[in-house]
Amino acid sequence: MTHTATTSGAASLWSTFELSLTGPTDGNPFLDVELRAIFRQGEREVRVNGFYDGDGVYKLRFLPDATGAWTWETRSNAPALDGLSGSVEVGAAQPGQHGPVRVKNRHHFAYADGTRYINIGTTAYVWNLQGDALEEETLATLAKAPFTKIRMCVFPKHYRYNENEPERYPFKLVTAGKSKWDGSFAGADKYGWKFDFTRFEPAYFRHLEKRINELAAIGVEADLIIFHPYDRWGFSRMSPAEDDRYLRYLTARLAAFPNVWWSMANEYDLMPQKTPQDWDRFINITADNDPFGHLLSVHNCFKFYDHNHPRITHASIQRSAANMSVVWRERYGKPVSIDECCYEGTIAELWGNISGQKMVRRFWDGVVNGGYVTHGETFNDGTDTIWWAKGGKLIGESVPRIAFLRRIMEEGPEEGLDPIKSTGAYRIAMQGGLDNVVLQQLFVPPEGEEGWAPAQAWWPTAGQPHRYYLSYMGENQPSEATVAVPPNERYSATLIDSWEMTETKLSDSVQRGDVLHFAPKPYLALLFKRID
């Protein structure tokens, strides 16, 4: 019996450390063998689950969050794997390694080492199942794009533009079925696919891991969709025991990858065969088997999941009204990520043909209302290689403008952009919209602003009080705006054209009540930075 660490005994902070062990091959190791390890440093213990990787190889993965010496010891019901022990010296983090993303300042994000993380996502559901040539093209595209996260599926996807079969499957294939899209994703049983759900295909997961690591190398988080309804193979209709075993296997393999997020579902409410109790169980299994505390969410189609669930870290939402981020962040007390706001493109489906201008506006609407927004692209160029499904190249107009917005955000406050509560937009939203406005309340000065000279501030604005204010005027096209910064403070004033990607200094020094004049056009923003 031998054991080896694939890192040759070396390890570094926030990098996956792996132990590879040789064990039994008889019977069904996926069912029969239990393996875990305890990593210790002083009084601390971190328990990790092992998994079978095929061909008699068992693996344990650990994500060190502290430098120095760690010891490890295995526990298993297989004698050959039980009671093994060793140690590893964890060195300093390698360049670019910051650890998993966490929630910070209630509504924002940061890496585990405190480095700021700005959530700017895109969606390419099964880019990782398209063969090496297209997958490598997608990675090259992402390396030049502004996105810091990609939403992607663990399982393959059945839908229009997704009739090709993957090279591998997550479970042992018993009988191949049909692949043609017939206009409906319902009824996976009619396609004739059969799998042995008691036997995983390790090569499928190794390929997924390869792509996740390649995303990490270019600074992109993998927001992994664990379940989804778009299915011709039966993966959305496994039994509860099969679902649970899949979750445990997946978390054992991937929890030690620093750039993984758990998205329990894409459109959980389109899987009526799974009950609220099922989703609660899935959340708990995933969180219980992730000792490294990755972000976790549940994405909707129609009805929101209850984002107040204590183990949900952020609200992953499908809605076009990104401006509602201001309401949802207060409702849930968590970061809001509008992970589907429709797609820039030209396909027939209603959600897949908004303009680049609309996509950019939704990004800005989300940001100035304290949220984050995810991009998607669905251009019909006569092929079925569409970014939203398969990746490849990005051809839309929104991407460079999202990059422009990202730069503005990066240059903004380290704490993140929070809605400014004195604006008309904020106060109307907090009263439940125009239908619910109580006029007297609308004009009562917010706490702390009593006695301030009047200054109309209707536009949604985000920033940090007394330091930084970013207002977005959307499709409106005023020719002037009143400066509504706090009294007795001076600010620089910059006009931002979010579509033309320009910044024009309007004044080096303004104060409350000053009036700024500029050429009227839509999609403008005003940025005020304190100078005194």
Can you annotate each of these PLM segments?
Residues 50-52, 507-510:
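Short beta-strand segments within Ig-like beta-sandwich modules, predominantly Fibronectin type-III
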Residues 54, 66-67, 487, 512, ...:
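Surface-exposed loops/turns
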Residues 95-323:
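Active-site mouth of glycoside hydrolases
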Residues 64, 84-86, 90-93, 310, ...:
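Mature catalytic domains of secreted/periplasmic carbohydrate-active enzymes
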Residues 1-44, 48-51, 87-93, 451-461:
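Non-catalytic, glycine-rich low-complexity segments
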Residues 5, 11, 28-29, 346, ...:
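Aromatic- and carboxylate-lined catalytic core of secreted/periplasmic carbohydrate-active enzymes
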